[in-house]
Amino acid sequence: MPVYCKSQCGNRAVLRRPKTGDALCKECFFAAFEAEIHHTISSNQLFQPGQKIAVAASGGKDSTVLAHVLKLLNEKHNYGLDLVLLSIDEGISGYRDDSLETVKQNRDDYQMSLKILSYEELYGWTMDRIVAQIGRSNNCTFCGVFRRQALDRGAKLLQVDSIATGHNADDIAETVLMNILRGDTARLRRCTDIRTGGGEDSIPRVKPLKYSYEKDIVMYAHYKKLVYFSTECVFAPNAYRGHARAFLKDLEKVRPSVIMDIIYSGEQLRFKDTVKKPVRGTCSRCGFVSSQQPCKACVLLEGLNRGLPKLGIGKKSKGDRMIAEQNRELDLRERANLVKNDF
């Protein structure tokens, strides 16, 4: 006996939506998925008419679906946005060079301008060279720190009002778990925020796919026949996030709603007033947003350039302490010179 679409459109169902379990035809699934993202955008006032938005594009399923849906909703609901693609080339052979070809295809398909920035031009290093020096351990720390700052640099260069990232519900639930397991209350406070950053010295980031399940995104890309790059990063198997992801998938088998349950729990967490919250400022070296002096990117880069890459690893690394001590010495010298010049 055929199963018909739950929306009562009269068409036969061709899929069962992972997030809700509803049997839907393709068109009704598309409409429900897009309407959900539109509701997320409008209810959280993520954009304003006339803004220029950089879509962080990696060529993967999330950023490809995000670019496609934002273009569609921008035209359908008259958001009045100027959408551009911003990609970061980490310098990972056999992975990023191939995925960037997909990004270029997205640029042509969606008729958006594209800006590509590389670690090589920004930092003088590629991830291939970094991994060759430090090994397979902690490479995601370097890549994550450099990538976040590279997006800020690219956004500033493009003079955009905000950056839209493809973080989905699964990503956010994984991050909540990771921060709980690591006892990282500072990141736990903000990891469920749909908008982060902003202010005088930083460009805000928004997550339009915050409530979209990864399985829904894959299904949408499949039935829409979108072109995306599906190969996992060659360095990803060693990432700590993989353990949180595996744990989450096991929980999901027992309780399908666990992804949204974790996100809602993260949103409702309350912290004691005695828990110190990092103060976001500007790095004294590179001038970009940071909650420490100097910023983590500068600390890691300092270690690489000095041939001591592990200086910057850890919550309060040896590199942090060393550079802070250097800064104190420089400050004392400057003060001594000022006093000397006064006489």
Swiss-Prot record:
Q: Name one Pfam family in it.
A: zn-ribbon_14
Major location category of this protein: cytoplasm
- Which key words are in the record? Cytoplasm, RNA-binding, Transferase, tRNA processing, tRNA-binding
Report if keyword Acyltransferase is assigned.
no
RNA-binding is among the record's keywords = yes
The top EC class, named as a word, is: transferase
What are the subcellular locations of this protein? Cytoplasm
One of the record's GO molecular function terms:
nucleotidyltransferase activity
Q: Which GO terms describe its cellular component?
A: cytosol; cytosolic tRNA wobble base thiouridylase complex; mitochondrion
The pathway noted for it is: tRNA modification; 5-methoxycarbonylmethyl-2-thiouridine-tRNA biosynthesis
* InterPro entries (alphabetical): CTU1-like_ATP-bd, CTU1_C, Ncs6/Tuc1/Ctu1, Rossmann-like_a/b/a_fold, TilS/TtcA_N, tRNA_thiolation_TtcA_Ctu1, TtuA-like_LIM_N, UPF0021_CS
Enzyme Commission identifier(s): 2.7.7.-
Which SUPFAM superfamilies does this entry report, sorted A to Z? Answer: Adenine nucleotide alpha hydrolases-like
A GO biological process of this protein is: protein urmylation
- Explain the purpose of this protein: Plays a central role in 2-thiolation of mcm(5)S(2)U at tRNA wobble positions of tRNA(Lys), tRNA(Glu) and tRNA(Gln). Directly binds tRNAs and probably acts by catalyzing adenylation of tRNAs, an intermediate required for 2-thiolation. It is unclear whether it acts as a sulfurtransferase that transfers sulfur from thiocarboxylated URM1 onto the uridine of tRNAs at wobble position.
NCBIfam families tied to this protein: TIGR00269 family protein
Q: What family does the entry list?
A: Belongs to the TtcA family. CTU1/NCS6/ATPBD3 subfamily.
Q: What is the protein name for this chain?
A: Cytoplasmic tRNA 2-thiolation protein 1
Q: Which organism is it from?
A: Drosophila willistoni
